[in-house]
Structures are given as C-alpha cells and as structure tokens.
Amino acid sequence: MDRDHTSVEQEHSERFVDMASRTNRLGILQNPDGYGKRIGDCGDTIELYLSVRGDRIQMVSFQIQGCLNTNACANTLAYLVEGRSVADSWQVTPENVFDYLETLPPDHRHCAELVVGAFYHALNDYSATRQESWQKAYTKR
C-alpha cells in the first residue's frame, strides 16, 4: 500500500475511505434521464447522469475532474439517492453528504455543494425532459 493511501486511511473515517475509493459509478450513462454539470471555483468539474424508473432513481453515474474529496462526495450522493423517489431526493443536501462522510475536511465542504448542485441540475433536467419527452432523443452534454 502506498504512503498516500495509508495517510488517507489514517486521517479519515471508514465511510470516507470507502466512498473516496469507489470507481463503480464512474462513466457516462447512455441515454440518461437527467444530466447536470457544475464547475467549482476550485476548478473541479462534475458531470452527473441519472437513470430513473417508475419515479425512483435507479442509477447515478458521473465523470469527475477533481480531487479525492469530490469523488467521495459524488459516491456518497449516489449512495444516498439511489432507490429513492425523485421527489424525496430533492431533500438531500450538502450537509447530508458532509455528515455521512464524517471526516470531509471543512475547507472542502464546497465539494459536497458542487456535487449536490450538479445533482439538482440533473433533477431539473429530468423534470424538464419528462414535460418535453422529445428532448430525450438528443444527447445531453
């Protein structure tokens, strides 16, 4: 195990380490039901994709250009919303992500805000696409 990974494990909660190291949600979801993108002041960028079935969020995937903290926040958001109704998912806040991770550094709280902001954009996109179903035929990016 390299020194950087050992340092992360020593400085962070088990939840943080788990969420920061996951890669199973990385990637572009083909024909997403919702898409959101945010670029943070720090330069981190997240593109977030939603798959919704029966008004429940079935899957969240994302692409990130950013730090380990942003990856941890994105995986946490996905964990918190997958399986929930779209309406209920609007209740997820950056504070929920911050609290779940337990050891997200306070000076990286903006990572949770960035991820949740992209998620809200994806929810808005999903709602707009449902109203204008012809839009789903076009690539979102």
Labelled PLM ranges:
Residues 69-84:
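Alpha-helical support elements that line or immediately flank enzyme active sites
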Residues 56-61, 71:
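Short small-residue beta-strand/loop micro-motif enriched in glycine and branched aliphatics
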Residues 64-73, 111:
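Short, thiol/selenol-centered motifs that function as redox-active sites or metal-ligating centers
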Residues 44-54:
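Short beta-strand elements
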Residues 1-30, 35, 53, 58, ...:
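C-terminal binding/interaction regions
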Residues 30, 46, 69-70, 86:
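Short, flexible micro-motifs
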Residues 29, 39-43:
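A short catalytic or substrate-binding loop motif that flags glycine-/basic-rich loops and adjacent residues
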